[in-house]
Amino acid sequence: TASSASLPAAYGSVVINEIHYNPATSQGSDNDYEFLELYNMSTSDVDLHGMTVGQVGSTTSIASLDSVTISAGSYVVVAYTGATYSSLTVPVVDNAGYFGLRNDGNALELIDSTGAVVDNVTYDDYYDWPRDPDGGGPSLELIDASSDNNLASSWRGHGISGGTPGAANSAQPDISMGSSITSYQTVSSTATATFQLN
Protein backbone atom coordinates (compact mmCIF):
# COMPACT_ATOMS: atom_id res chain seq x y z
CA THR A 1 0.00 0.00 0.00
CA ALA A 2 1.42 3.36 -1.02
CA SER A 3 1.84 5.91 1.72
CA SER A 4 0.99 9.55 1.17
CA ALA A 5 4.71 10.32 1.15
CA SER A 6 5.30 8.01 -1.80
CA LEU A 7 2.58 9.45 -4.01
CA PRO A 8 3.49 11.86 -6.85
CA ALA A 9 3.46 15.50 -5.77
CA ALA A 10 0.82 16.26 -8.39
CA TYR A 11 -1.35 13.23 -7.58
CA GLY A 12 -4.93 14.33 -7.03
CA SER A 13 -4.08 17.92 -7.92
CA VAL A 14 -3.18 18.06 -11.62
CA VAL A 15 -5.70 16.57 -14.03
CA ILE A 16 -6.27 16.25 -17.76
CA ASN A 17 -8.99 18.87 -18.07
CA GLU A 18 -9.61 19.61 -21.76
CA ILE A 19 -8.91 17.74 -25.00
CA HIS A 20 -9.20 19.38 -28.43
CA TYR A 21 -8.47 16.34 -30.56
CA ASN A 22 -10.24 17.11 -33.85
CA PRO A 23 -10.61 20.83 -34.59
CA ALA A 24 -13.29 21.89 -37.06
CA THR A 25 -12.13 22.35 -40.64
CA SER A 26 -13.10 26.03 -40.35
CA GLN A 27 -10.65 26.47 -37.46
CA GLY A 28 -7.69 24.90 -39.23
CA SER A 29 -5.68 21.72 -39.38
CA ASP A 30 -5.26 19.26 -36.53
CA ASN A 31 -1.52 19.91 -36.64
CA ASP A 32 -2.05 23.59 -35.94
CA TYR A 33 -4.89 23.56 -33.42
CA GLU A 34 -4.85 20.31 -31.44
CA PHE A 35 -4.20 20.78 -27.73
CA LEU A 36 -4.51 19.11 -24.38
CA GLU A 37 -4.94 21.13 -21.20
CA LEU A 38 -3.85 20.29 -17.66
CA TYR A 39 -5.45 21.96 -14.64
CA ASN A 40 -4.04 22.36 -11.13
CA MET A 41 -7.02 22.29 -8.79
CA SER A 42 -4.90 22.67 -5.66
CA THR A 43 -4.03 25.83 -3.75
CA SER A 44 -0.29 25.34 -4.31
CA ASP A 45 1.94 25.62 -7.36
CA VAL A 46 3.10 22.24 -8.73
CA ASP A 47 6.51 21.73 -10.36
CA LEU A 48 6.06 19.35 -13.31
CA HIS A 49 9.79 18.69 -13.75
CA GLY A 50 10.39 15.15 -14.99
CA MET A 51 6.76 14.59 -15.90
CA THR A 52 5.34 13.63 -19.29
CA VAL A 53 1.90 13.49 -20.85
CA GLY A 54 0.88 11.52 -23.90
CA GLN A 55 -0.48 8.31 -25.32
CA VAL A 56 -0.46 5.29 -23.03
CA GLY A 57 2.35 2.90 -23.90
CA SER A 58 3.97 5.20 -26.47
CA THR A 59 7.60 6.26 -26.40
CA THR A 60 7.21 8.86 -29.15
CA SER A 61 3.73 10.42 -28.80
CA ILE A 62 4.56 12.09 -25.50
CA ALA A 63 5.36 15.61 -24.35
CA SER A 64 7.96 16.49 -21.74
CA LEU A 65 6.84 18.91 -19.04
CA ASP A 66 10.36 19.72 -17.81
CA SER A 67 10.87 23.31 -16.63
CA VAL A 68 7.11 23.82 -16.35
CA THR A 69 5.38 24.93 -13.17
CA ILE A 70 1.60 24.99 -13.07
CA SER A 71 0.28 27.69 -10.77
CA ALA A 72 -2.43 27.03 -8.21
CA GLY A 73 -5.83 27.09 -9.88
CA SER A 74 -4.27 27.53 -13.29
CA TYR A 75 -3.48 25.65 -16.48
CA VAL A 76 -0.81 24.33 -18.82
CA VAL A 77 -1.55 23.84 -22.51
CA VAL A 78 0.26 21.11 -24.45
CA ALA A 79 -0.05 21.77 -28.18
CA TYR A 80 0.98 20.02 -31.36
CA THR A 81 2.06 23.46 -32.59
CA GLY A 82 2.80 25.70 -29.62
CA ALA A 83 3.05 28.85 -31.73
CA THR A 84 -0.72 28.70 -32.29
CA TYR A 85 -1.29 29.35 -28.60
CA SER A 86 1.73 31.53 -27.83
CA SER A 87 -0.48 34.49 -26.85
CA LEU A 88 -1.92 32.63 -23.85
CA THR A 89 -0.91 33.83 -20.40
CA VAL A 90 -0.35 30.27 -19.11
CA PRO A 91 2.62 28.00 -19.94
CA VAL A 92 2.36 26.46 -23.41
CA VAL A 93 4.36 23.32 -24.17
CA ASP A 94 5.29 23.15 -27.86
CA ASN A 95 5.83 19.50 -28.60
CA ALA A 96 7.50 20.15 -31.94
CA GLY A 97 5.02 18.02 -33.84
CA TYR A 98 5.57 14.77 -31.95
CA PHE A 99 2.42 14.93 -29.86
CA GLY A 100 -0.81 13.96 -31.58
CA LEU A 101 -4.36 13.26 -30.44
CA ARG A 102 -6.19 10.57 -32.36
CA ASN A 103 -9.54 11.55 -33.85
CA ASP A 104 -11.12 8.17 -33.11
CA GLY A 105 -10.27 8.10 -29.41
CA ASN A 106 -7.14 7.69 -27.37
CA ALA A 107 -5.79 6.63 -23.99
CA LEU A 108 -3.77 9.44 -22.40
CA GLU A 109 -1.75 9.53 -19.22
CA LEU A 110 0.18 12.00 -17.09
CA ILE A 111 3.30 10.35 -15.64
CA ASP A 112 5.63 11.70 -12.95
CA SER A 113 9.42 11.38 -12.82
CA THR A 114 9.22 8.04 -10.98
CA GLY A 115 6.95 6.51 -13.61
CA ALA A 116 3.86 6.74 -11.40
CA VAL A 117 0.56 7.60 -13.08
CA VAL A 118 -0.75 10.96 -11.88
CA ASP A 119 -3.84 10.98 -14.09
CA ASN A 120 -5.18 9.10 -17.09
CA VAL A 121 -8.20 9.31 -19.35
CA THR A 122 -9.43 7.27 -22.30
CA TYR A 123 -11.68 9.40 -24.51
CA ASP A 124 -13.68 8.27 -27.52
CA ASP A 125 -15.75 9.72 -30.35
CA TYR A 126 -18.74 7.39 -30.06
CA TYR A 127 -21.07 5.60 -27.63
CA ASP A 128 -21.61 7.80 -24.58
CA TRP A 129 -18.94 10.37 -25.40
CA PRO A 130 -19.93 13.82 -26.73
CA ARG A 131 -19.90 13.87 -30.53
CA ASP A 132 -19.43 17.58 -31.28
CA PRO A 133 -15.70 17.64 -30.39
CA ASP A 134 -15.08 15.20 -33.26
CA GLY A 135 -14.71 17.90 -35.90
CA GLY A 136 -17.73 19.94 -34.86
CA GLY A 137 -15.84 22.84 -33.27
CA PRO A 138 -15.81 22.56 -29.47
CA SER A 139 -13.33 20.61 -27.38
CA LEU A 140 -13.97 17.93 -24.78
CA GLU A 141 -14.25 19.82 -21.49
CA LEU A 142 -14.22 18.28 -18.04
CA ILE A 143 -17.32 19.49 -16.18
CA ASP A 144 -15.84 19.18 -12.70
CA ALA A 145 -12.10 18.76 -12.17
CA SER A 146 -12.68 16.61 -9.11
CA SER A 147 -14.83 14.09 -11.00
CA ASP A 148 -13.71 10.80 -12.57
CA ASN A 149 -12.43 11.93 -15.95
CA ASN A 150 -12.57 8.39 -17.33
CA LEU A 151 -16.36 8.58 -17.35
CA ALA A 152 -17.96 9.97 -20.50
CA SER A 153 -20.62 11.62 -18.31
CA SER A 154 -17.90 13.77 -16.71
CA TRP A 155 -17.28 15.58 -20.03
CA ARG A 156 -19.23 17.96 -22.23
CA GLY A 157 -18.61 18.95 -25.80
CA HIS A 158 -21.08 21.66 -26.76
CA GLY A 159 -19.20 24.73 -25.62
CA ILE A 160 -17.15 27.39 -27.36
CA SER A 161 -15.80 26.57 -30.82
CA GLY A 162 -12.07 26.03 -30.51
CA GLY A 163 -12.33 25.27 -26.81
CA THR A 164 -11.06 27.31 -23.89
CA PRO A 165 -7.28 26.72 -23.79
CA GLY A 166 -5.67 28.24 -20.71
CA ALA A 167 -8.99 29.36 -19.24
CA ALA A 168 -11.95 28.02 -17.28
CA ASN A 169 -14.00 25.48 -19.18
CA SER A 170 -17.30 26.63 -20.60
CA ALA A 171 -18.80 23.37 -19.30
CA GLN A 172 -19.77 23.87 -15.68
CA PRO A 173 -21.51 21.56 -13.19
CA ASP A 174 -25.29 21.68 -13.20
CA ILE A 175 -26.65 23.73 -10.34
CA SER A 176 -29.13 21.90 -8.18
CA MET A 177 -31.23 23.73 -5.65
CA GLY A 178 -33.34 22.19 -2.96
CA SER A 179 -36.20 23.93 -1.24
CA SER A 180 -38.55 23.05 1.56
CA ILE A 181 -41.36 24.70 3.46
CA THR A 182 -40.38 24.94 7.11
CA SER A 183 -43.54 26.61 8.37
CA TYR A 184 -46.77 28.07 7.12
CA GLN A 185 -49.79 29.89 8.48
CA THR A 186 -53.25 29.72 6.97
CA VAL A 187 -55.10 32.98 6.53
CA SER A 188 -58.47 31.46 5.57
CA SER A 189 -60.01 28.10 4.93
CA THR A 190 -59.84 28.68 1.16
CA ALA A 191 -56.30 30.08 0.86
CA THR A 192 -54.31 29.03 -2.24
CA ALA A 193 -50.52 29.09 -2.42
CA THR A 194 -48.50 29.04 -5.65
CA PHE A 195 -44.77 28.36 -5.83
CA GLN A 196 -42.45 28.82 -8.77
CA LEU A 197 -38.73 28.12 -9.10
CA ASN A 198 -36.77 29.76 -11.90
Question: Whereabouts are the PLM-identified features?
Answer:
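Short, solvent-exposed loop/linker segments at the N-terminal edge
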Residues: 24-29, 183-192
